[in-house]
């Protein structure tokens, strides 16, 4: 959520910056609500002051006017007016809150303007793209050849966009996630955290998935409590949700920053906005595993910490020796809560394209304001909002798909990345 005072005092600045990302701020609506809020708050304060004065001095007035019934009636009337206006003000404040919750974050001044992914700025490339002297296969064909996928059973059990893995491919999938966790905890200093996959929906408002992206979520209802709303719980689309909400309503000590957390969880997405795209394989599924890295940082450090976190995600790809490129997302391609985002895109030879395997974003204080997460700043001697940074480190399914394609052999075998062979795959060199 944006700072409400920024809208109150610099609404034209906010309007122009939001326009960069294609969002049209309704200045008239906000101005009218703010005008009404000021009037109501002033009236409530005036009436409350009169009520307090009369109540405070009623004993003294009683000595002057033995019959004080009229005074008591005035106090009762004032109290009723105050209650009515407070109720009206509460409704208005809720409307303003909903208005603010639907406004995306301001894009960083240094990211490129653009209309979509074609306008993203390539920052760097790493790795050597192989030349194959045979007809290459995609990851679905390769996995099927090794009897590692069971798409039919997955569809029978759960429907489309689900997968079942078996044997050595299932093993590789499992150890990939373990390798990522080990790297981030042992070398990068993150604290491994186990979190729920089912969360109350207020947590999704906190990180910014709600209210705008409600159709991209899977919801759950408890049949044990009929009073609960149908959408009271949801399956997490990313571990960013529970990890960030760990700091809801917290006031941290400045010395605690930065806080670095990592979690591997199943993630669930309806992919409602991706109908007809990547309907086969591991690229776009309703359920997938992802290792998420999150940092809770001091505002003065957040941009530098974004660079650091992105390097941590890149390290996974480098150790696996997977060719990738790093792109800086343009204004209309960044996520709702993000101010600046880097995408890491791994090479898929069967498609002759790079595909996203990680997004690393700086949310500034956007999420912190929504969850009321602050720290005590020693220099300013006051409580200010933290900054939140997060990224995929990495999406396990897409990483597996990239390994299958980039490490495929002419005879259909898959060479296992060297970093995984002895420590994770019991010395196995090939999937065959």
Curated annotation (Swiss-Prot):
List of residues binding L-serine: 238-240, 292, 392
Provide a GO biological process annotation. Answer: seryl-tRNA aminoacylation
Enumerate the PROSITE patterns for this protein.
Answer: AA_TRNA_LIGASE_II
Residues holding ATP: 269-271, 356-359
List the transmembrane segments: none
Q: In which pathway does it act?
A: Aminoacyl-tRNA biosynthesis; selenocysteinyl-tRNA(Sec) biosynthesis; L-seryl-tRNA(Sec) from L-serine and tRNA(Sec): step 1/1
Q: Where is it located?
A: Cytoplasm
Q: Spell out the GO cellular component terms annotated for this protein, sorted alphabetically and separated by semicolons.
A: cytoplasm
Please name the GO terms that the record assigns under molecular function. Answer: ATP binding; serine-tRNA ligase activity
Alphabetic keyword roster: Aminoacyl-tRNA synthetase, ATP-binding, Cytoplasm, Ligase, Nucleotide-binding, Protein biosynthesis
Q: What is its EC number?
A: 6.1.1.11
UniProt cross-references to Pfam families, sorted A to Z? Seryl_tRNA_N, tRNA-synt_2b
Q: Which reaction does it catalyse?
A: tRNA(Ser) + L-serine + ATP = L-seryl-tRNA(Ser) + AMP + diphosphate + H(+); tRNA(Sec) + L-serine + ATP = L-seryl-tRNA(Sec) + AMP + diphosphate + H(+)
Give the top-level enzyme category: ligase
Q: Which NCBIfam families match?
A: serS
Instruction: Tell me the domain comment.
Output: Consists of two distinct domains, a catalytic core and a N-terminal extension that is involved in tRNA binding.
* Family statement drawn from the similarity comment of this UniProt entry: Belongs to the class-II aminoacyl-tRNA synthetase family. Type-1 seryl-tRNA synthetase subfamily.
**What PANTHER family does this protein's entry cite?**
SERINE--TRNA LIGASE (PTHR43697:SF1), SERYL-TRNA SYNTHETASE (PTHR43697)
Biological role stated in the UniProt entry: Catalyzes the attachment of serine to tRNA(Ser). Is also able to aminoacylate tRNA(Sec) with serine, to form the misacylated tRNA L-seryl-tRNA(Sec), which will be further converted into selenocysteinyl-tRNA(Sec).
Quaternary state and interactors: Homodimer. The tRNA molecule binds across the dimer.
Protein name, as recorded: Serine--tRNA ligase
From the UniProt record, report the name of the gene that encodes this protein. Answer: serS
């Amino acid at each position: 959520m944006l700072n409400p005072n920024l809208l109150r005092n610099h609404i034209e600045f906010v309007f122009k910056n939001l326009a960069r990302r294609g969002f049209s701020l309704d200045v008239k609506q906000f101005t009218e609500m703010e005008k009404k809020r000021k009037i109501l708050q002033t009236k409530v304060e005036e009436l409350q002051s009169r009520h307090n004065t009369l109540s405070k001095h009623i004993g003294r007035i009683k000595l002057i006017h033995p019959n004080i019934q009229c005074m008591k009636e005035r106090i009762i009337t004032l109290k009723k007016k105050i209650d009515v206006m407070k109720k009206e003000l509460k409704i208005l404040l809720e409307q303003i809150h909903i208005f603010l919750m639907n406004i995306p974050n301001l894009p960083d001044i240094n990211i490129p303007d653009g209309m979509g992914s074609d306008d993203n700025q390539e920052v760097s490339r790493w790795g050597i793209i192989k030349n194959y002297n045979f007809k290459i296969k995609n990851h679905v064909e390769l996995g099927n050849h090794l009897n590692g996928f069971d798409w039919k059973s997955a569809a029978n059990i759960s429907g489309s966009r689900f997968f079942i893995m078996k044997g050595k491919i299932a093993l590789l999938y499992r150890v990939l996630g373990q390798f990522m966790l080990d790297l981030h905890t042992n070398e990068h200093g993150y604290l491994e955290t186990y979190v729920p996959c089912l969360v109350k929906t207020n947590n999704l408002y906190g990180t910014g998935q709600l209210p705008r992206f409600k159709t991209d979520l899977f919801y759950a209802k408890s049949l044990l409590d009929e009073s609960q709303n149908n959408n009271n719980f949801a399956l997490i689309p990313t571990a960013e949700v529970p990890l960030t909400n760990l700091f809801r309503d917290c006031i941290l000590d400045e010395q605690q920053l930065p806080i670095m957390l990592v979690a591997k969880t199943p993630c669930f997405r309806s992919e409602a906005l991706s109908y007809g795209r990547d309907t086969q394989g591991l690229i776009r599924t309703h359920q997938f595993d992802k290792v998420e890295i999150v940092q809770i940082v001091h505002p003065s450090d957040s941009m530098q910490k974004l660079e650091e976190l992105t390097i941590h995600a890149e390290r996974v790809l480098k150790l696996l020796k997977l060719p990738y490129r790093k792109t800086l997302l343009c204004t209309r391609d960044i996520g709702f809560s993000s101010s600046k985002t880097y995408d890491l895109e791994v090479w898929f030879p069967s498609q002759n394209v790079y595909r996203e395997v990680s997004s690393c974003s700086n949310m500034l204080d956007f999420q912190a304001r929504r969850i009321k997460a602050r720290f005590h700043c020693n220099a300013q001697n006051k409580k200010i909002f933290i900054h939140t940074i997060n990224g995929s480190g990495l999406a396990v399914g897409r990483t597996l798909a990239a390994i299958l394609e980039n490490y495929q052999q002419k005879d259909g075998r898959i060479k296992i990345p060297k970093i995984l062979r002895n420590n994770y795959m019991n010395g196995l060199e090939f999937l065959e």
